[in-house]
Amino acid sequence: MRYLLVDRIMALEPGNKITGVKNVAMSEDFLEFHFPKNPIMPGIMLLEALIQLSGWLDAASSDFRKWFLVSRVLKCSFYGFVFPGDQVELTVSVGPAPSHDLKIYSGAARVNGKRKIKAEFQGNLVDLETIEEVEEQKRFFQILTRSG
């Protein structure tokens, strides 16, 4: 199963920063087992949402020629739980690159202004056409940004 963890892109500064939203619904299948009597969004899914948002930043900044693939999580801290019904505000910024072929991002997720995760991760850009249908990604981006 493929998880799409960004429900809306709210703002974009090409090559620099992106903000988005994840709405956590009770119907999310990962909540069935995490945990049945007290469902919370797994922290790794919050990290994945930040990583997916990084991909959208690189796609939009490269006219949908590139996509970010994470290779390493450098730092990650969690600060409380995310529950069904929460709206998670996601922010990702480009950090200083240690080399030409590596990118570093820092990201955070908040619910009602309270930080839930802070992370720094690195990876590489790949040609989008090698992993996704470019036109489909452009159409999906229009839906996420409500620009279509």
Model-found features: residue ranges?
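Catalytic strand-loop segment that frames the active site of acyl-thioester-processing enzymes
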Residues: 1-41
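Hydrophobic core residues within well-ordered beta-strands of beta-rich domains
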Residues: 3-5, 88, 103
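Conserved positions in beta-strands of structured domains
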Residues: 7-10, 74, 79, 93-95
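Short, hydrophobic/aromatic-enriched beta-strand segments in well-ordered soluble domains
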Residues: 22, 91-94
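Compact, glycine-rich, soluble single-domain proteins
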Residues: 34-42, 46-56, 70
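Hydrophobic beta-strand-centered segment that forms part of the acyl-chain substrate-binding groove
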Residues: 53-89, 119-126
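HotDog/MaoC-like acyl-thioester-processing domains
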Residues: 84-86, 93-148
